[in-house]
Amino acid sequence: MLSKSSVEVIREDNATHSFCGLASVGWLYQKIKDSFFLILGTHTCAHLIQNALGMMIFARPRFGVALVEEEDLSKEHPQLKPLIEEIKADHHPSVIFLMSSCTPEVMKVDFDALSRELSTPELPVLFVPASGLDYAFSQSEDSVLQALSMFCPEAEAGDKKVVFLGSINDAVADDFVAEAEALGIPVGGFLPSNHFNDLPAIGKDTIIAPLQPYLAKVATKLSRERGAKVLTTQFPLGPDGTRKFWEDLAAEFGKKVDLSAREKAAWERIKEHTDLLKGKKIVLTADTLMELPLSRFLKNAGADVVECSSSYINRRFHGPELAALEGVKVVEQPNFNRQLRDIESIRPDLVVTSLMTANPLAGQGHIVKWSMEFVLMPIHGWSGVNALAAMFTRPLRRKAALPPMDDPAWTAGIMPSAT
C-alpha cells in the first residue's frame, strides 16, 4: 500500500556529491563469494580501489581493474578476452560483473555488447553501470542486483515466501531468518545470495522485503517483470523501523503481531545513547541515500534533525520514511553552497556528511560523521540497534572528551623550545 505523506520535499539544483560507486565492490565481492568484479577504468580507478578497500594486489582479491589506455580510443571496445581467461584460471568464478566507470562512459563504450561477447553459458559476464557520472555511492549495488535478478528462478504459483532484498553480512542475515521463522514467515532467500547458483526463486506470489533504501530500481524491476509484491514499509533500522518492518511483513502473510514491547525494550537498551542525542541539532547531507531512515531514527530518538538531504527520493519506495519525517526539512539534490552557509549559520551539534566535505567541515570546528560508514556497518534489525545508535554518539563523546586547546595536556612532555 502506498503511504500518503504530507511532508514537503524541497527540490534544489545541485549535482550529486557522493563517494564513487565503484567502492560497492568492497562489500559485494565479500557477499557473493563465487563472483569476480572487473572494473573497466583508469589508473585513478585502480588507485581508488586499492587504497579505499585496503587490499594489496598480492592478496589476490576477487576484483580488479582493466586499464583503459590511449590505444583503446581507436577501438570499438577494449579487448578483454585474455583477461577474462586469466580470471577464470586464477579464481574460478561463477559470475563476472563488468563495471563501468566515468572514462569508458564518456568514450561511449558499448558495455552491453562487450558483456555479451565475453559471456559463455558456463560463465556469464554481466554489465553493471556504476559510473559516478550517474550513480551515487550506494546505487551501484542496485545495478548489481538488477543484473543478477534475471538469473533468479521463477517461483511456482502459490509459493508465497519473503525474499529479503539487499546485501547484509551473514550474521545479520541469520538473525533475519531466525526472526522470520519465529513469526511464522516462510523465507525464500536473499538477493544477493552468497553464491550465484543459490539465487532465490521469485514469482508473482513472492514478497520482496527491501532492507536498504537505495534499491528502488531493482525493486521496481522485480515487481514489473516477475509480478512480485514489494513490501512498502520503513526500513529495519532502529527500534522503530525494525518493529514497523516486521509487523508489516507479518501482515502480508496474514499474521497480526504486536512488537511494541520489543521496541520499548530496544529503546531502553540504548538509553545512554538517546539521552545524549536528545535535543542535539543534526544535519544530514546527501551521500548514501540512507539519509531518510537515519533521520527518522534520530527524530524518534529525540534529536532535532535540522535538515535531511538526499541525492534521490522515490516518493513510492521511500513513502513510509517520508511520512515519519513530519516537521523535518527534507531536501532532494541540495544546493551545496546554500547548505554550507546554513551549516555555518546553524552550527549544528553533528553533521553526517560525505568524505569530500567531512574534513573541511571539521576544519571549521564542526563535529562530523562519515556517512559512508552507515553502509558498511551491521546496523540492521534488532541486533544492529546498539551499533546504529553508537555511530551517532561516538563523535559526540570523542569531542566531549577532548581537553580545550589551552589545556596543559596538549603540551605535557614537550620540550620548552617546542612551545
Swiss-Prot record:
User: Where is [4Fe-4S] cluster annotated to bind?
Assistant: 20, 45, 102
One Pfam short name: Oxidored_nitro
Query: How is the cofactor bound, as the UniProt entry phrases it?
Result: Binds 1 [4Fe-4S] cluster per heterodimer. The cluster is bound at the heterodimer interface by residues from both subunits.
Keyword Oxidoreductase listed? The answer is: yes
Task: Enumerate the catalysed reactions.
Answer: chlorophyllide a + oxidized 2[4Fe-4S]-[ferredoxin] + 2 ADP + 2 phosphate = protochlorophyllide a + reduced 2[4Fe-4S]-[ferredoxin] + 2 ATP + 2 H2O
| Top EC group | oxidoreductase
Q: Which UniProt keywords apply?
A: 4Fe-4S, ATP-binding, Bacteriochlorophyll biosynthesis, Chlorophyll biosynthesis, Iron, Iron-sulfur, Metal-binding, Nucleotide-binding, Oxidoreductase, Photosynthesis
Q: Which GO terms describe its molecular function?
A: 4 iron, 4 sulfur cluster binding; ATP binding; metal ion binding; oxidoreductase activity, acting on iron-sulfur proteins as donors; oxidoreductase activity, acting on the CH-CH group of donors, iron-sulfur protein as acceptor
Q: Please give the superkingdom of this protein's source.
A: Bacteria
Pathway(s) the chain acts in: Porphyrin-containing compound metabolism; bacteriochlorophyll biosynthesis (light-independent)
What EC number is given for this enzyme? 1.3.7.7
Cofactor (UniProt): [4Fe-4S] cluster
| GO BP, sorted A to Z | light-independent bacteriochlorophyll biosynthetic process; photosynthesis, dark reaction
InterPro entries the UniProt entry points to: LIPOR_BchN/ChlN, Nase/OxRdtase_comp1, Protochl_reductN
**Subunit structure, as described in the record:** Protochlorophyllide reductase is composed of three subunits; BchL, BchN and BchB. Forms a heterotetramer of two BchB and two BchN subunits.
Question: What family does the Swiss-Prot or TrEMBL record give for this protein?
Answer: Belongs to the BchN/ChlN family.
Give the HAMAP family listed for this entry.
Answer: ChlN_BchN (MF_00352)
Tell me, in a sentence or two, what this protein's role is: Component of the dark-operative protochlorophyllide reductase (DPOR) that uses Mg-ATP and reduced ferredoxin to reduce ring D of protochlorophyllide (Pchlide) to form chlorophyllide a (Chlide). This reaction is light-independent. The NB-protein (BchN-BchB) is the catalytic component of the complex.
The protein, known as = Light-independent protochlorophyllide reductase subunit N
Please name the source species: Chloroherpeton thalassium (strain ATCC 35110 / GB-78)
Give me the gene this protein comes from. bchN
